[in-house]
A protein has these predicted regions:
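AMP-binding (ANL) adenylation modules
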Residues: 47, 218-220
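Short aromatic-enriched loop/helix-cap "lid" or pocket-rim segments at secondary-structure transitions
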Residues: 5, 15, 55, 106-107, ...
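Mobile, glycine-enriched helix-loop/loop "lid" segments at the mouths of ligand-binding/catalytic clefts
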Residues: 8-26, 227-248
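Radical SAM [4Fe-4S] cluster-binding motif and immediate context
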Residues: 17-183, 190, 195, 200-203
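Radical SAM enzyme core and accessory elements
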Residues: 225-228, 235-318
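Flexible, acidic/Gly-rich N-terminal and inter-domain linker regions that tether
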Residues: 1-26, 51, 272, 290, ...
């Protein structure tokens, strides 16, 4: 049985604050995120995303393509409440799919957050104008999480990303100039991927040089355009349909006539090694570690986790 879809909630201010639930049920010090300061708090200021990325689960199955937002006053009220309830918080993360989808709103929100004196981060698309970047930075923005996905323009077209490589380069350069950190995310194995485009993406990542990166494998979630596309084109078969293994390690479910599952899977480790094992990047990480005992402890923990991750992937491959 499939019931009719419920009407989408339009008045987002009707939603209760989530932070009192955190206060009641969570010890936030137990939750770590490699690119955010610790401890941090994360919540939403809106639902939905205007982008039509073929692989993305959230707008296609949950939030929709209209960005429905809480009022700025409602968001600021919750942040102010959370400041008092969690004085130990070092950073707030706004987990909207793309907080920068509405430039006038994010600028106005930033100016109100600036009055509270908080440090914050958010998801962003790599097309934010420099003028907006300045406003956000001057009002507490420290970091963007940016989905670059690939360094190949044709693949960006294939996945309907709505982004051009030159815009991403300019945005990243502006962020570097303004002192805004970037955690860049990339996806290998998207439609149109080849050995050559993987190499192109690795070179692109090292060229633009975000502060940190995350490299994922294309995941054809049921309900997405990518899933339907994969079935129609024979890129997904029953013997390799799982997205993760029993230990949570991500698998490479897609394959192409010119690119096998294992070639896509193995390229993730190659990507990480070539990005992080560069002299300049190593020097940057060491410099961060020497900046404070907290950063030393954090980077050492992350290093252990990183090598554990690589070992798990290598064991899975064999």
């Amino acid at each position: 049985m499939h019931n009719e879809e419920r009407p989408i909630l339009e008045d987002m201010d009707r939603l209760p604050f989530v932070t009192p639930v955190y206060k009641r049920d969570l010890k936030i010090e137990n939750y770590f995120n490699g690119y955010l300061r610790h401890p941090y708090l994360s919540f939403y200021t809106g639902r939905g995303c205007k982008s039509h990325c073929t692989f993305c689960l959230w707008p296609q199955t949950v939030g929709g393509y209209r960005y429905r937002t809480r009022s700025i006053g409602h968001v600021v009220e919750e942040v102010a409440w959370a400041q008092k309830a969690f004085p130990q918080v070092k950073e707030f993360f706004f987990d909207d799919d793309t907080l920068t989808d509405n430039l006038p709103r994010v600028q106005a929100l930033a100016q109100e957050l600036g009055k509270l004196g908080i440090v914050w981060a958010c998801n962003a698309k790599a097309n934010v104008p420099r003028e907006t970047l300045k406003i956000l930075r001057d009002n507490g923005l420290r970091l963007f999480l940016v989905g670059y996905e690939t360094g190949n323009q044709q693949i960006l077209y294939n996945i309907k990303k709505g982004m051009r490589i030159e815009f991403a380069r300019r945005f990243t350069r502006d962020c570097h100039d303004l002192g805004i950190k970037i955690h860049g995310t990339f996806i290998l194995g998207l439609p149109g991927e080849t050995k050559e485009t993987i190499e192109e993406t690795i070179r692109f990542a090292t060229e633009i040089n975000p502060h940190t990166i995350q490299v994922s494998l294309a995941a054809p979630y049921p309900g997405t355009y990518l899933h339907r596309q994969a079935l129609e084109n024979g890129w997904l078969d029953n013997s390799n349909a799982e997205l993760v293994d029993e230990y949570g390690v991500q698998l490479a479910p897609l394959h192409y006539p010119h690119l096998t599952h294992s070639e896509i899977f193995d390229s993730v480790e190659t990507f990480y090694r070539r990005f992080y094992f560069r002299a300049g990047k190593i020097a940057s990480i060491v410099g961060e570690m020497l900046s404070s005992p907290q950063m030393m402890k954090r980077r050492l923990r992350e290093g252990v986790e990183f090598f554990h991750f690589l070992r798990e992937r290598r064991e899975l491959a064999h």
